């Protein structure tokens, strides 16, 4: 625990209400709802949310490698903070890779959040279509050459 103390102390020193393992969800109409609501469309749990008037901080602790950080997770948590805490206009977010002492930062404002939500809705619509039709179009990536078990894929071995 001593190894992580400096990171934890710096977060603890940020002013505001601290919410640990904070659960958030929104409906398809982007209205905030209970995490377990049957009407939820998307939900997530933020490791730490700090609310300080019109500003918020969102932190997600990681123990793995920082080689491929997923900033999308930060964006989604920030968007849900804007819905659950309408007074918040700016979110500073971070993936904190504890073991590697690396921090990936991002900042979001509530201005233009409709465009970010539209992007998420498009991504979900693609997934919904794949689930509904059991169609999963192949997409080449770095695993195709040596790691993909689907040998009949057009990209296998690329």
What are these regions (language model features)?
Residues 1-158:
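RecB-family 4Fe-4S metal-dependent nuclease core
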């Amino acid at each position: 625990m001593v190894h992580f103390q400096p990171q934890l102390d710096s977060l603890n020193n940020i002013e505001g209400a601290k919410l640990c393992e904070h659960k958030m969800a929104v409906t398809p109409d982007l209205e905030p709802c209970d995490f377990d609501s049957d009407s939820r469309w998307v939900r997530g749990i933020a490791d730490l949310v700090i609310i300080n008037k019109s500003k918020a901080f969102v932190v997600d602790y990681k123990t793995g490698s920082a080689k491929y950080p997923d900033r999308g997770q930060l964006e989604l948590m920030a968007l849900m903070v804007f819905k659950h805490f309408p007074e918040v206009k700016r979110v500073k977010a971070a993936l904190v890779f504890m073991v590697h002492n690396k921090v990936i930062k991002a900042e979001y404002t509530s201005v233009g959040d409709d465009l970010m939500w539209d992007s998420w809705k498009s991504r979900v619509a693609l997934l919904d279509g794949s689930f509904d039709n059991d169609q999963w179009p192949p997409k080449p990536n770095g695993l195709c050459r040596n790691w993909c078990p689907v040998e009949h894929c057009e990209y296998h071995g690329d």
